[in-house]
Amino acid sequence: MEQFEATSVEQAYLRWKEGKTALVDIRDPQSYEAGHAPGAFHLTNSSLHTFMQQTDFDQPVMVMCYHGNSSKGAAQYLLQQGFDVVYSIDGGFEAWARSYPQDITSESR
């Protein structure tokens, strides 16, 4: 795959429920701590190396941001780092929270 794929929040949710994809959240630390999808890896410049060590490059990766814009650049970057299949989630966390409020956790819970 040379280009990331955009995926709807519904498709992303189904992939996430199957447990076969890695889900990364690239929002700022305060937003991530306030609420994120359970099991989402908080991907930052400082955590990128850890993520790359812990994740198989042939495992699909889904990237979530605020609204589905910043995730596109991050998804393309992950492809350039060698990940085989990367998705950018359309609508980002905003769409996830609106569609699946029951599947949000926070660091304070």
Swiss-Prot record:
Keyword line: Cytoplasm, Transferase
PROSITE patterns (UniProt xref): RHODANESE_3
Reactions this protein catalyses: thiosulfate + hydrogen cyanide = thiocyanate + sulfite + 2 H(+); thiosulfate + [thioredoxin]-dithiol = [thioredoxin]-disulfide + hydrogen sulfide + sulfite + 2 H(+)
SUPFAM superfamilies: Rhodanese/Cell cycle control phosphatase
Main location: cytoplasm
EC assignment: 2.8.1.1
Source organism, top-level taxon: Bacteria
GO BP: any one term: glycerol metabolic process
Keyword Transferase listed: yes
Gene3D superfamilies the UniProt entry points to: Rhodanese-like domain (3.40.250.10)
GO molecular-function terms, A-Z: thiosulfate-cyanide sulfurtransferase activity
Compartment(s) of residence: Cytoplasm
Domain Rhodanese, residue spans: 17-105
Catalytic site positions: C65
Pfam families hit by this protein: Rhodanese (PF00581)
HAMAP family to which the protein is assigned, alphabetical: Thiosulf_sulfurtr
PANTHER family in alphabetical order: FAD-DEPENDENT OXIDOREDUCTASE, THIOSULFATE SULFURTRANSFERASE GLPE
Job description of the protein: Transferase that catalyzes the transfer of sulfur from thiosulfate to thiophilic acceptors such as cyanide or dithiols. May function in a CysM-independent thiosulfate assimilation pathway by catalyzing the conversion of thiosulfate to sulfite, which can then be used for L-cysteine biosynthesis.
Protein family per UniProt: Belongs to the GlpE family.
Protein name, as recorded: Thiosulfate sulfurtransferase GlpE
Source organism (scientific name): Yersinia pestis
Gene name per UniProt: glpE
